[in-house]
Curated annotation (Swiss-Prot):
<keyword id="KW-0694">RNA-binding</keyword>
<dbReference type="GO" id="GO:0005829">
    <property type="term" value="C:cytosol"/>
</dbReference>
<dbReference type="GO" id="GO:0000049">
    <property type="term" value="F:tRNA binding"/>
</dbReference>
<dbReference type="InterPro" id="IPR018163">
    <property type="entry name" value="Thr/Ala-tRNA-synth_IIc_edit"/>
</dbReference>
<dbReference type="InterPro" id="IPR050058">
    <property type="entry name" value="Ala-tRNA_ligase"/>
</dbReference>
<keyword id="KW-0030">Aminoacyl-tRNA synthetase</keyword>
<keyword id="KW-0862">Zinc</keyword>
<keyword id="KW-0963">Cytoplasm</keyword>
<comment type="similarity">
    <text>Belongs to the class-II aminoacyl-tRNA synthetase family.</text>
</comment>
<dbReference type="InterPro" id="IPR018162">
    <property type="entry name" value="Ala-tRNA-ligase_IIc_anticod-bd"/>
</dbReference>
<feature type="binding site">
    <location>
        <position position="704"/>
    </location>
    <ligand>
        <name>Zn(2+)</name>
    </ligand>
</feature>
<dbReference type="InterPro" id="IPR018164">
    <property type="entry name" value="Ala-tRNA-synth_IIc_N"/>
</dbReference>
<dbReference type="GO" id="GO:0004813">
    <property type="term" value="F:alanine-tRNA ligase activity"/>
</dbReference>
<keyword id="KW-0648">Protein biosynthesis</keyword>
<dbReference type="InterPro" id="IPR018165">
    <property type="entry name" value="Ala-tRNA-synth_IIc_core"/>
</dbReference>
<protein>
    <recommendedName>
        <fullName>Alanine--tRNA ligase</fullName>
        <ecNumber>6.1.1.7</ecNumber>
    </recommendedName>
</protein>
<comment type="function">
    <text>Catalyzes the attachment of alanine to tRNA(Ala) in a two-step reaction: alanine is first activated by ATP to form Ala-AMP and then transferred to the acceptor end of tRNA(Ala). Also edits incorrectly charged Ser-tRNA(Ala) and Gly-tRNA(Ala) via its editing domain.</text>
</comment>
Length: 930
């Protein structure tokens, strides 16, 4: 498009287009969900329409369209670092509730993309669900290039998010060109689903056929529905042709306001620099985070949310405190930040007029939070300076500062990133500038005083992260809830060896807002018992579930003092009453096997692969085992098989296990491995040491098998890179989980392998790379190797299919071309039926380059649509002063058509075939040629 569309114009074009297709516009709803406990925030365009799709409410129309404001915070750390991550964004959508389905949805999609937004079909790529041939054919029919359409499996093209309608989907991608393809990989990026900034998904169209109850139980919908989503910010980025979403008009003018008050400037060219300056990267991140987070907070407060220590309030507090940190670094005062707020509201008030009405409330709320932030920073730096006056700061000091005194974790992460990259003078200075930008004291802090082992800090922080991620609603509570922090000493104990308790006394009750109560009736709550059999999430092991009396226990975490807090659904309790508890024995038994297997796998990695392997973290649940470790290369399949074999060998020994209580020195003397030594040193009593076998002795507080034979079976199921030198290995144990994996995942992999060769045989093409895998003994190789081979075969077969299609197309094109060129007249009319449009076009291109003095008028009727093409050789048209657009206008007027094109080739559609009128056109051309 000649003029770049603004974000507001793009939104209006979308809504106006669908209103022209008889859709009713639904206003953008509040970010705070109404009557939907499954969501903390509205996080998608369809989230506010779920009751319409389920049939619980009648929609205002069967066809709906909207631009829904959304908020997601699951990857907040990526904001400002990647091109497209946001906390706040708008999702454009069109919806059909029991009205149109695939055909119309794809027709609308093609028309909007190709004709309204005028995106070049050559730059559009499509994915469809592998079993959805109808969508594939519809895209081809509506102008998509066949070779640009990729069939994908369920993981990529089956849409579901939480509870509600779901089904197969088709996605539209846009190719932004080589300047966004730094490695020059081309289409490989799209076809192999490699993360990139070149091929960007802009629209997802979901064919809703099922309802997910939130527990992956699917039922057929009584009526077929369509729901779609297109990110407004992404569309703006593409239509405005800028490097990132943060370079679109909605961000640029806010950035200018920040620059007005800061001594730092945003670097517009940084994206394209191959070697990025660390200070520029940090400065750009500051700008983007401030704008993104402020926008999210402005909308959320205007919708009724307020900062606090829990749930939505905690999210707002975190977003604001991150913003304040980066404002400090850019030296922008709170007073000047008011203009940032005003500008964001001005950008959005046309479509969201309610923002202007809430301006004063927003500013006052943010000011209160800023005052609390300053108080927190003052307290944390006071403690930091006390520590620095006594000694150098180590990892445990820093951990305590963050978790107890509220020192910003973002500062720690920035220091870690800079100081582990390179300790050159520039990075050291930047690190000092960052920490001192929020330092309220005139006395500057020197980086030389911070002797921090960041790896050790990460280990200390692992458990904190695990609990926070396990229950996002209590993340803020664990750090800041005074009621829990100030719990009195309680006589409460956990017994590893029992699976039920009788007559346990209720010591404490908290309601769902973490307020202590004496009694609770039929409400979600947290309780502490004097004795419990429920294991609490700790050390990477998932908590037990079960029942207290008749009430479900769905989570168990530890209080800051170590008491087990049981989350109970709709419980009825009062302090002092006696209750019975029973864990889910099946799940506990599985987790025992999983945890013991993780120890054996770790030991086997060190012995089979290398003693230099260093564990970074682990997680054990009833579904899988994950173990993160550092190593300088990827494991070979032979090594993975060796690890499996070694773990199975120890299982087969049926070695009795032991739990020993030892001091730290005693544990180390017997060869026990431990990863939290700084924590263990603070424990005055004895430590729990698990002895599985001579090869595996670890300090551990988890639940384990009593005999290695109890594990039954073991299998490695995954190996992925987490970054340079960091790996994650996944596994399962027990007959139950291994058999489940074999019957579901491995069986499918074997079926896929066989199907690829079946397809290869059908193609009747010989390929050396495919032939190489033909004799693979899939029973003797590891599943992960089979998975890799399948990926190679999948890509290779797809390439061969495209090659075959091109060969067939070329052959058919030549056959039709020959029919065209047999004619020796200067003009000729051809009436055809059911010829593929692309095939016809290719044939005519060949024909006009062979029969260089002939004008062709071709009529082709396909599925009731009458297509015309009028063309000749380009030089012939030019030499004879022919402009076929003039004849196309005449043809359109007489036969109810529309179309046009270049001077030597025009195409379009007509409503009827009238040979007399068509020949008149050719007669006119003939007359001009004489």
């Amino acid at each position: 498009m000649s003029k770049k569309l603004t974000t507001n114009e793009i939104r209006k074009l979308w809504l106006d287009f669908f209103k022209s297709k008889n859709h009713t516009e639904v206003e953008s709803k509040s970010l705070i969900p109404k009557n939907d406990d499954s969501l903390l925030w509205i996080n998608s365009g369809v989230a506010t329409l779920k009751t319409f799709f389920s049939g619980k409410e009648n929609p205002p129309s069967k066809r709906l369209t909207n631009s829904q404001r959304c908020l997601r915070t699951n990857d907040i750390e990526n904001v400002g670092l990647t091109s497209r991550h946001h906390t706040f964004f708008e999702m454009l959508g069109n919806f059909s509730i029991g009205d149109y389905f695939r055909k119309e949805a794809i027709e609308f999609g093609a028309e909007l993309v190709f004709k309204v937004f005028k995106l070049d079909p050559k730059k559009i790529y499509i994915t469809v669900y592998e079993e959805d041939q109808e969508s594939f054919d519809l895209w081809v029919k509506n102008g998509a290039i066949k070779s640009h359409i990729l069939k994908c499996d369920k993981s990529r093209n089956f849409w579901e998010i939480g509870s509600g309608p779901c089904g197969p989907c088709t996605e539209i991608y846009y190719d932004r060109g080589e300047k966004y393809d730094f490695q020059k990989l081309g289409e490989k990026l799209f076809f192999e689903d490699i993360e990139n900034d070149r091929y960007i998904e802009i629209w997802n169209i979901v064919f809703s056929e099922f309802n997910n109850d939130g527990k992956n139980n699917y039922t057929k919908l009584a009526r077929q529905n369509i729901d779609t989503g297109a990110g407004l910010e992404r569309l703006a980025c593409i239509l405005q042709d800028v490097p990132t979403n943060y370079d679109t008009d909605a961000f640029v003018n806010v950035r200018s306001v920040i620059e007005k008050y800061s001594n730092k400037k945003y670097d517009n060219n940084l994206y394209f620099e191959s070697k990025k300056d660390s200070e520029k990267v940090f400065i750009n991140k500051c700008f983007s985070v401030i704008i993104d987070h402020f926008k999210a907070v402005i909308f959320a407060i205007s919708d009724g949310a307020l900062p606090s220590n829990k749930d939505r309030g905690y999210i707002l507090r975190k977003l604001l405190r991150r913003s304040f940190l980066y404002l400090n670094y850019l030296k922008v005062s709170f007073e000047n930040s008011k203009e940032i707020i005003n500008t964001i509201i001005s950008n959005n008030e046309t479509y969201y007029p309610y923002l202007k009405e809430n301006l004063n409330n927003v500013i006052n709320t943010i000011k209160l939070e800023y005052d609390l932030y300053c108080e927190s920073i003052n307290n944390s730096f006071k403690k930091l300076n006390e520590l620095l006056n006594k000694k150098l700061l180590d990892a445990s000091d820093l951990f305590n500062l963050v978790t107890t005194y509220g020192f910003p974790i973002e500062i720690v992460q920035s220091l870690q990133e800079l100081l582990t990259q390179s300790k050159d003078a520039k990075n050291l200075k930047l690190a000092e500038d960052i920490i001192n930008s929020i330092n309220p004291s005139d006395k500057k802090i020197s980086i030389s005083k911070l002797k921090i082992e960041f790896d050790e800090f990460e280990k200390l922080f692992d458990e904190h992260r695990l609990i926070a991620n396990a229950n996002a609603s209590v993340k803020g509570m664990e750090n800041q809830n005074e009621e829990l922090l100030n719990l009195p000493t309680l006589d409460s104990s956990f017994d590893y060896e029992i699976e039920s308790v009788k007559n346990s006394k209720v010591l404490k009750i908290f309601d769902e807002n973490w307020k202590p109560v004496e009694e609770i009736k039929n409400k979600d709550c947290w309780v502490i018992l004097d004795k419990t059999c429920f294991f609490a999430t700790t050390g990477g092991q998932e908590h037990d579930t079960g029942k207290i009396n008749k009430f479900d226990v769905v989570d168990v975490i530890k209080s800051p003092q170590g008491y087990h807090l049981h989350k109970v659904v709709k419980g009825t309790f009062k302090i002092g009453e006696k209750v019975d508890g029973q864990i889910n024995s099946f799940d506990r038994n599985i987790i025992r096997k999983q945890h013991s297997s993780e120890h054996l796998m770790h030991s086997a990695l060190k012995r089979v692969v290398s003693p230099t392997i260093k564990q970074e973290g682990a997680f054990k649940s009833i579904e899988k085992i994950t173990l993160d470790f550092s190593f300088n290369r990827k494991l070979t399949y032979k090594e993975i098989l060796g690890v499996e074999k070694e773990v199975k060998r120890i299982i087969a020994t049926k070695n009795p296990t032991q739990v020993l209580m030892k001091t730290l020195d005693e544990a180390k003397e017997m060869g026990a491995i431990g990863y939290f030594e700084q924590v263990y040193k603070k424990i005055s009593g004895k430590l729990r040491v698990l002895y599985l076998c001579p090869e595996s002795i670890e300090i551990c507080g988890g639940t384990h098998v009593y005999n290695t034979g109890d594990i039954e079976d073991f299998m490695v199921t995954g190996l992925t890179s987490k970054g340079s030198g960091s790996w994650r290995i996944e596994a399962v144990s027990s007959n139950y989980l291994v058999d489940k994996f074999k019957n579901n995942v491995i069986k499918k992999a074997i079926d896929d392998f066989n199907n690829y060769f079946k397809k290869y045989k059908e193609l009747n093409i010989k390929d050396d790379e495919v032939e190489k895998y033909k004799k693979t003994d899939i029973n003797s190789i590891h599943y992960l190797e089979l998975k890799e081979i399948n990926e190679i075969l999948k890509n290779k077969i797809n390439t061969l299919v495209i090659r075959k299609e091109k060969e067939n197309l070329s052959k058919e094109s030549n056959e039709i071309k020959n029919k065209f060129t047999e004619v020796k007249e200067s003009t000729k009319l051809f009436l055809l039926k059911d010829i593929d449009r692309k095939l016809l076009f290719n044939s005519l291109v060949l024909a006009i380059n062979e029969a260089k003095s002939t004008v062709f008028l071709v009529i082709n009727e396909v599925d009731g649509v009458i297509q015309y093409v009028l063309c000749s050789n380009e030089s012939f048209a030019k030499n004879n002063n022919l402009d076929f657009n003039l004849y196309a206008k005449d043809l359109n007027a007489k036969l109810g058509g529309k179309g046009g094109g270049r001077s030597y080739l025009v195409q379009g559609t007509i409503l009827k075939i009238d040979e007399k009128e068509l020949n008149k056109i050719l007669d006119t051309i003939n007359a001009k040629l004489k």
